[in-house]
């Protein structure tokens, strides 16, 4: 019969590999048109050609519970049980993303916990878009890494109940699995290393060359000049410069024009001159009058004699 498992197939998780799919869904697959026409007589080599024709992933859809081609090929692979190397090549295939998804689902169903973490976790770095068909027959966009995350953390994918998977930290404590390093951490390490290299280059650029050190060399045995002497010299030189400056400088014509044109300065100067002349004139007249009226004793005697003669 076409629905029987291969005689040389090994039991998986203590049971027939086809029994990993529920009986109701399995009978629907056997009755489907795609299974009868496309999956009859397929071998491990021919499954690859059918997997390359896949356009979406999904389980069953519609009221009649119709299986998708992706689910039919999954059951066919459980039936013929291809070798592990073929499944690994399915997962490593980067050209056909649905071939990769088919191999990942089969590895999750049949592989050990160590194999699942080893071969499926690298697919977290695949961010390509894929189409998924839900129960209503509608297509939904999702990414490869989302599908892989569901395989490792969900209980049911594509309407298939997944076997129990041992926790990762348990395998790490038992030293059966190394800690996972994400691509983001690797990028951060690269960025940090590049920043450190740039800082080292900047430090090397800041270090002065030996020629520069020779130029800036100073004899430490010679005493330094005190800042007070410098200050005194600067003060002693400043008056000379100030005394020389007015001799050298010539009055600018702009200042003369400004003085001649400004009426306020002219008025103030004329007032100062008048005030000075007034202040000087009373003293001068008083001294003159005092000299004219003040007579010597000889003159006073002569005038007294003349007055007597006139009276006589």
From Swiss-Prot:
Question: Region Disordered: start and end of each range?
Answer: 181-312
Q: Which InterPro entries match?
A: PRP38 (IPR005037), PRP38_C (IPR024767)
Per the record, the GO terms for biological process are: mRNA splicing, via spliceosome
Does Cell membrane show up as a keyword for this record? no
Where does it reside?
A: Nucleus
Q: Where are the transmembrane segments?
A: none
Keyword Coiled coil included in the entry's annotation: yes
User: Where does the protein principally reside?
Assistant: nucleus
**Keyword terms, alphabetized:** Coiled coil, mRNA processing, mRNA splicing, Nucleus, Phosphoprotein, Spliceosome
Coiled-coil residue spans:
170-204
- Gene Ontology CC annotations of this record: nucleoplasm; nucleus; U2-type precatalytic spliceosome
Feature: compositional bias, Basic residues: 225-294, 301-312
Domain of life, source organism? Eukaryota
Phosphoserine sites (modified residues): 11, 193-194, 209, 226
Task: Please explain the role this protein plays, according to its UniProt record.
Answer: Involved in pre-mRNA splicing as a component of the spliceosome.
Give the multimer and partner information: Component of the spliceosome B complex. Interacts (via N-terminal interaction domain) with ZMAT2 and MFAP1.
Q: What is this protein called?
A: Pre-mRNA-splicing factor 38A
Q: What is the lineage of its organism?
A: Eukaryota, Metazoa, Chordata, Craniata, Vertebrata
